[in-house]
Amino acid sequence: MKKVILPLLPALAAAMSAAAASMSEITVDLRMDASDYVVGERVRAVVDIVNSSPDTIGIGGKVRVWGKEGSNRVVRAEYDVNDRFFIEVYRTGDMSQLAKVSKGAFVADFALETGEGQKLETFIGDHFALGEPNRYMAKPVFVHAGVRYEGQPRVFDVVEGVRAVAAMQMFASRKSLQREFSLVYWARGRSEHVFLKAKDSNGRQWRTTDLGPILRIDKPEISVCADGKVFVLHRLNQDQFVRSEFWSLPDALEFRGRSSVLDPETAGTQSVRELYREGGVKPKQNPWWKFW
């Protein structure tokens, strides 16, 4: 028996080595921004593809590869690439695969020559219905010349968050429609963040916005104006608040920007000090008897 098995070991090892080398010609990886996402977030991740094969790979048809000549950006080459890249998403409980709900590509068009690599942004929530809290697994897949190259599966959770406060918006132009805004807390990295969620009475769920770190001394506030503006105020630290502005219409919800605001308890005193320092207001001299 030994005389039969031993000669096969080197051949088996060589075959396994060749198979491993073949499978490592193209590597694809998926890096999640976080391990937990609040319902409605876009679920951002970065796709990392490295081409160690002798071929030029990519997606998008005719794709230009750019280079530099001095300080100028020039076209170095143009390739016709028709490989496939996609992400498979499963519920970890029963390993049921989710259907893709979008028609768009997962990443931007690209072409990679031998020895090149590229990082590409993707938003998993744009392509799959992740509206229910659950644990999911995402696996990146690249297909070239009929060979499927799979990356390491990544697990992430979709959660409701801890509800802090809510507000309701009514629309004069559409009486039957109501929009509920809610602010929720959840950990993100090493700090706690506050998120704005929005859902319409007809079931439409809008994209959840991460408003950044919050210090939970005070509850955050939502103000809904009659003209469609929505303001969120939350405490960033001991002396500073963040004011976020949104524009909310029956068929649109847009983030308009944010600004820093001094702590309301010290803002008045600080303003007076600035006026005195600049000479804008002269201190009033009160007679001593007016204090009695």
Where are these predicted regions, by residue range?
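Low-complexity, Pro/Ser/Thr- and charge-rich linker/hinge segments at domain boundaries
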Residues: 153-180, 259
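Bacterial N-terminal signal peptides
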Residues: 7-17
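Surface-exposed loop/turn elements that mediate protein-protein interactions on large endomembrane-trafficking
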Residues: 195-212, 242-260
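Positively charged n-region of N-terminal signal peptides that target proteins for export
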Residues: 1-4
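Repeated scaffold domains used in trafficking and secretory/extracellular systems
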Residues: 168-170, 214-223, 258-273
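Short beta-strand elements that form the blades of beta-propeller/WD-repeat-like
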Residues: 173-189, 193-196, 221-237, 268-284
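Contiguous segments within soluble domain cores/interaction surfaces
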Residues: 24-30, 38, 42, 50-123, ...
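Terminal connector regions
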Residues: 127-162
